[in-house]
């Protein structure tokens, strides 16, 4: 499971590092097999409130949207190298 916010972030990264050809491959070969949760206004607002209230500068809106979505869906494990997911109480793979 991923969110449309993560897709936007990923597209920007792929385009910047690998170019438009890689974006086409990503869109045609990878996106169709993903379960995508489309973020609504309520989740966006809740995540933004966390960002605004956060004591640290490096807390991203995309990460906060992911945390909120995972909690709402009962997801406890994340495939990520981002240590912030562990700080938020999620199990991270690879460990």
Residue ranges and their predicted role:
Residues 1-56, 68, 87-92:
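PIN-domain endoribonuclease scaffold, especially VapC-family toxins
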Residues 2, 59-60, 82, 94-95:
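Histidine- and aromatic-rich ligand-binding microenvironments
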Residues 9, 63, 82:
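Acidic active-site catalytic centers that drive phospho-/nucleotidyl reactions
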Residues 60-76:
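Acidic, metal-associated active-site segment
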């Amino acid at each position: 499971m991923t969110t449309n916010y993560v897709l936007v972030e990923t597209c920007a990264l792929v385009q910047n590092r690998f170019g438009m050809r890689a974006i086409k491959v990503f869109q045609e070969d990878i996106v169709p097999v993903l379960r995508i949760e489309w973020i609504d206004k309520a989740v966006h607002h809740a995540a933004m409130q966390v960002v605004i209230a956060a004591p640290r500068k490096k807390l991203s809106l995309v990460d906060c949207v992911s945390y909120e979505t995972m909690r709402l869906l009962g997801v406890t494990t994340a495939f990520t190298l981002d240590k912030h997911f562990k700080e938020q109480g999620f199990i991270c793979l690879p460990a």
